[in-house]
């Protein structure tokens, strides 16, 4: 799991 995956997940939660 890369940091990009974590960022994507956070963006989904904030969306």
Curated annotation (Swiss-Prot):
<comment type="pathway">
    <text>Carbohydrate metabolism; glyoxylate cycle; (S)-malate from isocitrate: step 1/2.</text>
</comment>
<dbReference type="GO" id="GO:0006097">
    <property type="term" value="P:glyoxylate cycle"/>
</dbReference>
<keyword id="KW-0456">Lyase</keyword>
<keyword id="KW-0460">Magnesium</keyword>
<keyword id="KW-0329">Glyoxylate bypass</keyword>
<comment type="subunit">
    <text>Homotetramer.</text>
</comment>
<comment type="function">
    <text>Involved in the metabolic adaptation in response to environmental changes. Catalyzes the reversible formation of succinate and glyoxylate from isocitrate, a key step of the glyoxylate cycle, which operates as an anaplerotic route for replenishing the tricarboxylic acid cycle during growth on fatty acid substrates.</text>
</comment>
<comment type="similarity">
    <text>Belongs to the isocitrate lyase/PEP mutase superfamily. Isocitrate lyase family.</text>
</comment>
<keyword id="KW-0464">Manganese</keyword>
<keyword id="KW-0408">Iron</keyword>
<protein>
    <recommendedName>
        <fullName>Isocitrate lyase</fullName>
        <ecNumber>4.1.3.1</ecNumber>
    </recommendedName>
</protein>
<keyword id="KW-0170">Cobalt</keyword>
<dbReference type="GO" id="GO:0006099">
    <property type="term" value="P:tricarboxylic acid cycle"/>
</dbReference>
<dbReference type="GO" id="GO:0004451">
    <property type="term" value="F:isocitrate lyase activity"/>
</dbReference>
<keyword id="KW-0816">Tricarboxylic acid cycle</keyword>
């Amino acid at each position: 799991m890369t940091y990009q995956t974590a960022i994507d997940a956070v963006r989904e939660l904030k969306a």
